[in-house]
Structure formats: structure tokens, C-alpha cells
Amino acid sequence: LKSFTRKLINDMETTKDTVILIKLLNQMNKTSLAIYASRRAVYRNVYIPYLNFPIPEEKLLKTYQENSYIPINVALAISRQESAFDKGAVSRAGARGLMQLMPRTARITARKINHKYIRKNLTLKPSYNIKLGSYYFKEMLEKFNGSYALALAAYNAGPNRVSRWLKTYGDPRKGDLDQVTWIELIPISETRNYV
């Protein structure tokens, strides 16, 4: 289905066709493919906001509600960006699951919340991944005094890098520069776009 969707989205000629495909994928609970299709459509100047940010199926949404340590909209936004709601996603760097946790980070976080670390559960059990990922983001938010921009950058690139960037470029929380300028100075394009 993934290959078929990729071929189909690249061959779409009208906005109407694109909307039909994305709606169909959402109805089939193929959220990650719907997000992929909507991202590809943007490259062709087809932007449909209400389709670009789908809410996952009810069962998964309930899992977020029951397991998140952070506001659900934040956990959903992180998961959409990190994995497009693909619970089995594994990045080239080795990050795993819905919230794309690196195994080492997951192990440390599991210990902090008195959970047994089980690597395979990062991709097999959404509740496990959401619990660990949301707790880790909560820690980043606390570490950077409630700054979502800094916490998101730390979640994606690591807190040590963010601390280095604060020393190098200045701290938007202190008024050294505005937040948008700080974000634009992030040297890793993936993290800059992520934030």
C-alpha cells in the first residue's frame, strides 16, 4: 500500500484527487500514509490544512489520553512530526516508535518512572512509547523553564546541543535575541524545521 500511495500521490493532477486520496487513507486508518500524501502534496503547492493534521484513530487517541505526561495536543504534534503516527517506525539513527525515542534515552527514562525497559515495546506497545516519550519531553520542558521551542529542539537534537547553542547564539528567554531568530540559527536543518 505504501508503494502504491507514493506512486499515486506523485501522479495526482488535481487538488480534488489529492483530497480524495488523503480522505480515503484517513478513513482506512492509514494515518501515516495520509500524512505522507499531504506532505508530498505541499511540494506541488497543494495545501489542505484540515487534512495535513489528522487526529489518529480513536483507540490510539485514547492511548495518548491515558498515558501522556504532557498536554495531549503536544504529544500528538510530536508524534505526527516524529513518526506520522507509525507505531513501528524506526529511524536511520535508531529512534523507535510513535515518539521516536532513542533506546538509551528510553532506558534512562524508564528507570526514572519505575518502568522496566523493554526495547521491543518501543515499537510494539504505543502506551509504553507514549509514556516514555511524553515524560522525556516533560523533562526537557522543565529543564528549559517552560520554553516549548527549546524543549522541542532538545527533544529532537538533545539537551546538550541546545545548551551549547544557547551559549553560542544567546538565550531568547533572557532577551538576548528573539525566539524566531534563535530558531533560525539552529545549525541542524532537521531540528530547525522540527521546531
Region annotations inferred by a language model:
Residues 2-195:
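Catalytic glycan-binding domains that act on GlcNAc-containing polysaccharides
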